[in-house]
Regions:
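Glycine/serine-rich loop-strand microenvironments at binding/catalytic pocket rims
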Residues: 45, 168-169, 174-204
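The feature captures the LRR N-terminal capping module
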Residues: 1-100, 104-168, 175-178, 208-210, ...
Length: 266
């Protein structure tokens, strides 16, 4: 199974390449992959859980496959696939993730977007090789605590949820480069976010933020050419600092707060 294999849709035959993955990262072109598809499938084929050398598994109805079946529960047997590095189960009807996912110690990418998840199992904190996690468009009301144990994480998307607070433990994600928090219910950010010195992309649009942490200007690695104001802060009732200051980058934000503190002292 050196080339990508398509399970189902026999009339179309196997795909010579799994284009979605190779477009996103050539690193995964030579992986042992499986794409579940087929309009007649009514459940996940149990045979796949005997493929213990499988490295990339896609079970997402709205990708290039013709899969109509939408999972409501990720099978516990997923734990048998100990060599998985990438798991794509977005655009299903998942309401929970089994604790067994914590046994997938080689997992590097996990896509859970467009489901109905309101929590994550504590066992997910064991995924210490995970560097990319997609959780957009779910039903999360807080940033699940297991996420803050994922020390290798460089990309985290929790956009379009109902998240109201960010825990101080987010400071543990020291390698994080991209944090997407758009379309949530945040009315504040902890100062701890400002300790994520490797952040290059931070999207906060369409929340309820009236102010930024006073240390926000310390995030000097933010790519302000890409994170201009309309992307970064649009849709927030910001007052401190005002949007026109934010759009000028970290130095202006730092100067704003320094000036503000001097005024307060006098």
């Amino acid at each position: 199974m050196d080339a990508a294999t398509s399970f189902g849709c026999a009339s179309k035959g196997p795909d010579p390449l799994w284009r979605y993955l190779t477009e996103h990262d050539p690193k995964y072109e030579r992986k042992k992959k499986l794409k579940i598809s087929g309009r007649e499938l009514a459940s996940v084929p149990t045979q796949i859980f005997s493929l213990d050398q499988l490295q990339v598994l896609e079970m997402s109805p709205e990708r290039e496959s013709c899969l109509r079946y939408r999972m409501e529960l990720l099978p516990q047997e997923i734990s048998r696939l100990r060599n998985l590095t990438c798991l794509y189960v977005d655009s299903n009807n998942l309401k929970k993730i089994p604790a067994e996912i914590g046994t997938l110690s080689h997992l590097e990418r996990l896509t859970l977007s467009n489901n109905n998840l309101s929590s994550l199992p504590p066992e997910m904190g064991a995924l210490q090789r995970l560097h990319s996690l997609h959780l957009a468009n779910n039903s999360l009301t807080e940033l699940p605590s297991p996420l803050c144990q994922l020390r290798s994480l460089t990309f985290l998307d929790v956009s379009d949820n109902k998240i109201g607070t960010i825990p101080s433990s987010i400071r543990q994600l020291e390698k994080l480069e991209t944090l997407l928090l758009l379309f949530n219910s945040l009315d504040s950010l902890p100062e701890d976010v400002c300790l994520l010195r490797n952040l290059r992309t931070l999207w906060l649009g369409n929340n309820h933020l009236q102010s930024l942490p006073t240390s926000f200007g310390e995030l000097v690695n933010l790519d302000w050419g890409y994170n201009y104001c309309s992307c970064n802060f649009e849709g927030n009732p910001l007052e401190s600092p005002p949007p026109e200051v934010c759009s000028r980058g970290p130095e202006e934000i730092k100067d704003y707060f320094l000036s503000f503190h001097r005024t307060q002292r006098h």
